[in-house]
């Protein structure tokens, strides 16, 4: 699975991660737009929600394993994992602590920017 990766520098690996995250978001948008054209916005939204509902737990399990987070890692563990999500790698974001709450905010969203450009 890692063939070719050994030849890359750390900087190239980081760039590849960013490219891959952007590609995943672009793929998500492409299939969404295709479904939207054929079936309408409501159906596309329904399928998008269903796909992300299935994907996010898998992504969380992989990040939890990578970071060696405990089952009850709390908001601190979440704050450690959120920056490594594919959507985080593809967008600009910030994490804020407000009282006892963790706020994760996408500050520059590739998907929303693309939709705004298209009108």
Where are these regions (language model features)?
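N-terminal accessory segment detector
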Residues: 1-103, 108-119
């Amino acid at each position: 699975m890692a063939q070719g990766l050994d030849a890359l520098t750390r900087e190239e690996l980081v760039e590849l991660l960013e490219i891959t995250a952007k590609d995943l978001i672009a793929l998500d948008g492409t299939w969404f737009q295709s479904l939207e054209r054929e079936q309408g916005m409501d159906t596309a939204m329904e399928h998008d929600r269903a796909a992300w509902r299935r994907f996010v737990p898998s992504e969380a399990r992989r990040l939890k394993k990578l970071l060696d987070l405990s089952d009850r890692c709390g908001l601190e563990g979440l704050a450690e994992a959120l920056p490594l999500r594919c959507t985080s790698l593809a967008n600009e974001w910030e994490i804020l602590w407000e009282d006892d709450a963790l706020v994760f905010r996408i500050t520059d969203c590739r998907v929303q920017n693309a939709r705004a450009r298209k009108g």
